[in-house]
Amino acid sequence: MSVPESHRPDDSTSAELVADEPGSSWFGHPPFRLPRREVIEAPRELTHDPSAIRRLNRWCWEVARFALPAVPVLVGVAWFDVLSGLEGRLTAAEFRLVALPCVTFASAAVLVVACIAMKWALIGRVRPGTHALWSCWCSRWDFLYVAWGMWAAVPLSFLEGTLMLPGVLRRFGCRIGRRALLGAGFAHVVDPDMLRFGDGVTVQALMQAHTFEDRVLKIDHVHVRDGATIGANAVLLYGADIGERSTVAPHSVVMKRERLEPDTAYEGVPTQPVAG
């Protein structure tokens, strides 16, 4: 598939020359036409022509972002002051083996707990649904995402690939079973309430539990059933349901509301069952 004004290299071959129909949607490698796309109608005041009040609401949340870095800075200053006060009163071994790790852990915990509290204060328990771009909910949702990246992402990155990370993510709203192993990328989750992981899963993928289409945010659950394995850099779109003990190969894409059968291996963009 070639886009308008694109460049074709010398000695290349086009197998078939067919014009796309206006308004059609395509995806995949090789690309295929999507049979239909869910279109959500929303008032233009919430999508393209916001009122002055809605513009003011968005500006307030955008300006508030400038205050977010102050929290980790203050925590860092407190960390330095506490350790400076303890250094002269403890032996070198006590300072390095006890005081330093304990104060560092406490500082990281403050940032994570503050982010958890902000999540429940700003958006509470999120349900599947739709939210227009200029709604107050979208502004608060986006503000939380930025705050998580500045406050909790770095401390939680040290827990990626361990059995401790699921315990923290449950406090954010994730539903995670026992012995779940979550790899890189789960230190900063966009939609924690949408993630449903069963027992014994192994996941190192992008959970795309929302999309913005026509300036409307659509959000829904992503299910990974017991014993399933999701490879590195795979993408699961909202509504995806991975069957028990199934395997999704790295760099694959599971489409919206697609259900993968249990005990089956999948790969591709979009995913297809692997023969044998």
Question: Which residues make up each language-model segment?
Answer:
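Soluble catalytic regions of membrane-associated enzymes that act on cell-envelope
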Residues: 181, 186-187, 193, 200-202
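Conserved short histidine dyad/triad with adjacent acidic residue
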Residues: 158-163, 181-184, 210-211
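Terminal amphipathic alpha-helical/low-complexity segments used for targeting or macromolecular assembly
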Residues: 24-173, 261-276
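Glycine-rich hexapeptide-repeat left-handed beta-helix
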Residues: 1-68, 195-196, 202-276
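Active-site-adjacent structural elements in folded domains
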Residues: 166-167, 188, 212-217
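Alpha-helix N-cap/loop-to-helix boundary motif
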Residues: 157-160, 172, 193, 199, ...
